[in-house]
Amino acid sequence: MEVLMAERADLVFHNKAIDGTAMKRLISRLIDHFGMAYTSHILDQVKTLGFQQATATSISLGIDDLLTIPSKGWLVQDAEQQSLTLEKNHHYGNVHAVEKLRQSIEIWYATSEYLRQEMNPNFRMTDPSNPVHIMSFSGARGNASQVHQLVGMRGLMSDPQGQMIDLPIQSNLREGLSLTEYIISCYGARKGVVDTAVRTSDAGYLTRRLVEVVQHIVVRRTDCGTIRRISVSPQNGMTEKIFIQTLIGRVLADDIYIGPRCIATRNQDIGIGLINRFITFRAQPIYIRTPFTCRSTSWICRLCYGRSPTHGDLVELGEAVGIIAGQSIGEPGTQLTLRTFHTGGVFTGGTAEHVRAPSNGKIKFNEDLVHPTRTRHGHPAFLCYIDLYVTIESQSIIHNVNIPPKSLILVQNDQYVESEQVIAEIRTGASTFHFKERVRKHIYSDSQGEMHWSTDVYHAPEYTYGNVHLLPKTSHLWILSGGPCRSSIVPFSIQKDQDQINVNSLFVEQRYISDLSVTNDRVRHKIFSSDPSGQKGGRIFDYDSGPDRIVSNSQFLYPAIPHENSDLLAKRRRNRFLIPFQYDQEQEKELMCPYGISTEIPINGILRRNSILAYFDDPRYRRSSSGITKYATIEVDSIVKKEDLIEYRGSKEFRPKYQTKVDRFFFIPEEVHILPGSSSIMVRNNSIIGVDTRITLNIRSRVGGLVRVERKKKRIELKIFSGDIHFPGETDKISRHSGILIPPGVVKKNSKKSKKKWKNWIYIQRITPTKKKYFVSVRPVVTYEIADGINLPTLFPQDLLQERDNMQLQVVNYIISGNGKPSRGIPQTSIQLVRTCLVLNWDQDLKGSLEEIHASFVEVRTNDLIRDFIRIDLVKSPISYTGKRNDTWGSGLNPDSISDCTNINPFYSKARLPSFTQPKGTVRTLRNKEYQSLIILSSSDCYQIGPFKDSKYNKTTNCHNITKELIKEDSPVPISNSLGPLGAVPKFLNFDSFSHLITHNQILLKKYLLLDNLKHTSQVMKYFLLDENGKIHNTDPCRNIFFNPSHLNWYSLHHDFFYETPITISLGQFICENVYIFEYGPHIKSGQVLIVQFDSLVIRSAKPHLATPGATVHGHYGEILYEGDTLVTFIYEKSRSGDITQGLPKVEQVLEVRSIDSISLNLEKRVEGWNERVTRILGIPWGFLIGAELTIAQSCISLVNKIQKVYRSQGVQIHNRHIEIVVRQITSKVLVSEDGMSNVFSPGELIGLLRAERTGRALEEAIRYRAILVGITRASLNTQSFISEASFQETARVLAKAALRGRIDWLKGLKENVVLGGMIPVGTGFKGLVHHSRQHNNIPLEIKKRNLFEFEGEMGDILFHHRQSFGSCIQKTFHETSEQSFGFGRFNDS
């Protein structure tokens, strides 16, 4: 007893709290000191003591112990404030949806993390003995993130696909979740309702496949004698921890020297002591043996495997290392399918490091070294390419900050920054463990209206005529509000753009008749000339004539040219020609002539080559019902069962009309009803109804057939397909394409019915109501043949077609709707399917670089006989005419001004032509008896309007003309309540309201003309008009849009606001919300300026969507979009989180070698590149062998790295060698590429690499093959044992094939023996199988080699001689390529 007491007196007494780490240290010291048995005894006593104390203190988790962090309230409030600002910015069009998502996720992630860091100090200060605090921070129970969910906030969750849900859960579990939050948290939580069962089965299946692939791999030899090796070096970005993990338990493949000293020899296994020496001496590089280097793929040797994981010694012979490997990869999957909390989806929150300002002061840097960009949150920033030195000058001291390259600078030069303000963000390199993946995000329109791009848009080359467009630069997409008018009464071609229509009358009168008797006083035409005798600036001729009369030409209304100048036209001039028109007096009275030629002359009168001059709607191609048009070059494809199903390849599409060279097209009728979303439908989707069935309360069906109901956001599309329904049997292979046309006379084989012949074409459409079941709808088709020449002389005057010298007119048929596009009919009207057009062309060679012509309507009166002409001028190049011609007609000012007189509206400006370098403008005056005012139109569409006080001179930047203006105050012109005649502009007191041609950007098609390489430009014009009721109207030949006043905003500004604001607003300009235009405050709504009046603007409201470069725009310019249509698709890179929810599918994806993400795609490309290069260097036989081997080595290493990355990010340690054994099986096959020796392998056969090598040597000729990655499922079905294949999957098929081929199973693996009940060749069963080959192992290596393969000696020498000679360069290129494309280390991580 005394001795014990004396010993105790010597011991040191520690008095401190012991937590997990201290406990670990204590135990390891006890083991070192006392050994295992005694330590366990001591620990038992500690445990008992702990239990006694815990019982006495009665520590338990009570709900009152969960104390919410006090700062949570304002933190959450702050985050909400930030996301509100973000939402506003998104609404104004400053950030797009992806940036908004990213930023909101980072805001909430930061809030959540901050709360988490607050937690511990908060507990420590307020309640240090709190049981929650004691338990979680001592490591006894619970960790920080779990407690954080109890007392902080749960934060962001990811959905089952691993995408973040950007609605954070703000409450914690102590406060309780709202219903929404509960449902969201079920997605993300560990024990999620949605989660566990599915994931567990996934992981189990993964394990099963893994074991299946590698079950036959057993340690059969001590040394296979391989010369291959893999280098590991601690340099390139490997952490020391990973370096140690990679090396420990491996076997060296080469001696390692430090200077002259050899510190380790070949075939020595590496322990921790040796590794420490490597690290201290920085030995470079270390060559090791791995399962990759082992010479056989069906077994493995002890030295290539290394130490056994169980008892740090070399692995025993007969150990089933394959099964161990498969299970050690699969098993963590079962544990890890459960989710981690916050790390889902998108955020790269932790990865960006910030540089903060050291003190207050002014920041300065060299602006030439940076250029502006957007951050990934859509904030403006500067990107620096090289190191940037930033100085911050405070009052007393100057701080220097060095910012590394590729960083973002978030402040401007000379800006005042406060201390600790973030001034730059450093992009982290590839050292982070994040997979990048490319994600598509679709943005849907939330309102209906017309699409508008604010930039030129590239057409992707393969979609030149389609509707997929790539954005070259950041810009806005605008959706201009306005809905299509679905009126059943008005035929579409009566109203032309700019017409004023009394909307109410449309629904009342059955016929729409315009009163032509009202003379049109308001239309004034200006004629410009540049008079050589006049001043340099060019005079303006005011031209006042009697009332113009309106000429009705077939269906369109145009103001006629005043007759005073008819004599000019009678003479034909060079480069100009006249088209006389058939002209009836009767037609003037009857506006709605049934069919007739309609001319299409744009209001600005400029026609380009190949533009349409006139068109004729042939009554034969009219349909009264909706339907789908199909046409293309018809190709007959023989599909399974050799039925001639015709499949339609997409034809090139022109927009808005589709020119066709086909001689026939098909129209598939269907009945379409577009109903409001609230309407109650009385039929079910996919049900079959008869004729005259009631669909909704007041609509009955006109045809019987299959009903398809499609719900969009605010409307329901209900289609009825006539025809019959056919349920295919097992044998009928119906093509999975969306629709096929079957020609008449084809016999449809069906087991149940007798043979059946179709008389007409039919359209077959496959409809899949559920995943398993599908049926086929067979619909009748109307076939239209297109006649080649429609009898022209009857349509167009004869002499016109004979003038060949200066113009060519071609007759072209256009199909109006696109291939496969639905044409929507409007009840009680007809749809025109084909339009015959007269296309204007002229000989490019004769006229030189003629780009465009000017066309106008002319009326010539001779002896009281009136005829109408279209006058067409050829304009040489837009600039060459300025001031040269001297006739009262000519294009006096440049064509950018008005060179023709066909504009209906007096105020108008043409689009900018790309060839103008100098913006010029024109001034036009209007003289009337009552008042006078001035408008300046310039090529940039800017204008200033208004009375100028005290006869001031008004100078404008764009115009060289100085004009003086006097305004007489007169009595206001009364506004009539009825509609004014066509083209009239409503007058108000003292100012003009004018509507104006709004020009859109020109879209450049990258199609060259045939004759010379002029870019072919097509201009898109839109016109809008306002009438007295505030309605705005825009029509196309095919659709009407009416705007209600609710879509517009009116502003009443000060009378003389032009003096107060320097900003001029141009017509057609887009204004974003919240922009300060005038001084009285920000602009309320975003939109496009339609009408500028003296003290008010009319703005058509529009919604901007921001799109960044590379985004894909769906839909055409000016197309009508409904709510819920796809607008843009963004492709953005997202960090794959290490979350195992994505991790497990990820591992599986790598093991099944599915090339889903971009990495494995370029892996395959690189593989091919390698094969070619190596073959070029080495000649064919060695090229294939070495090429395949290098390829395989490269892909092995990258696969191992990818799999390890997922597990390491979860903190799961799996030894590389397990993964390597599996990966070795994936890469052990090659594909025979061409039959060098037809009697050995057939091309396309999968054979083992070693077998290919050996056969090549034995035959003394090259077998051509290439490396291939085989997924684990495929590898399990491509083994040497058909019994193991059959027990895995597809039993009947595998056994039948094996029987037919007469395969022999040598029963080498475990599974075959288990199935047949033999002894398993591992462990003790291994010895008997092996002992007869013992003496073989004692033969010296050289003799054995020579006996086994005669050519082996020379072969080996040549091969490895080569390998050494360009081994160095291979390794170098390896390192480079693998680093570039994977962001992995070199060969190291393996």
Curated annotation (Swiss-Prot):
Subunit description: In plastids the minimal PEP RNA polymerase catalytic core is composed of four subunits: alpha, beta, beta', and beta''. When a (nuclear-encoded) sigma factor is associated with the core the holoenzyme is formed, which can initiate transcription.
Compartment(s) of residence: Plastid, Chloroplast
Keyword 4Fe-4S belongs to the record: no
Similarity annotation: Belongs to the RNA polymerase beta' chain family. RpoC2 subfamily.
EC category name: transferase
Catalysis: reaction(s): RNA(n) + a ribonucleoside 5'-triphosphate = RNA(n+1) + diphosphate
Name used for this protein in its record: DNA-directed RNA polymerase subunit beta''
Gene3D superfamilies: 1.10.132.30, 1.10.150.390, 1.10.1790.20, RNA polymerase Rpb1, domain 3 (1.10.274.100)
Keyword annotations: Chloroplast, DNA-directed RNA polymerase, Metal-binding, Nucleotidyltransferase, Plastid, Transcription, Transferase, Zinc
Note on how the cofactor is bound: Binds 1 Zn(2+) ion per subunit.
Name of one Pfam family that matches: RNA_pol_Rpb1_5
Residues of the signal peptide: none
UniProt keyword annotation of Ribosomal protein present: no
InterPro entries associated with the record: DNA-dir_RpoC2_beta_pp, RNA_pol_beta''_euk, RNA_pol_Rpb1_3_sf, RNA_pol_Rpb1_4, RNA_pol_Rpb1_5, Rpb1_funnel_sf
Organism: Ceratophyllum demersum
List of residues binding Zn(2+): 224, 294, 301, 304
GO biological process: DNA-templated transcription
Function: DNA-dependent RNA polymerase catalyzes the transcription of DNA into RNA using the four ribonucleoside triphosphates as substrates.
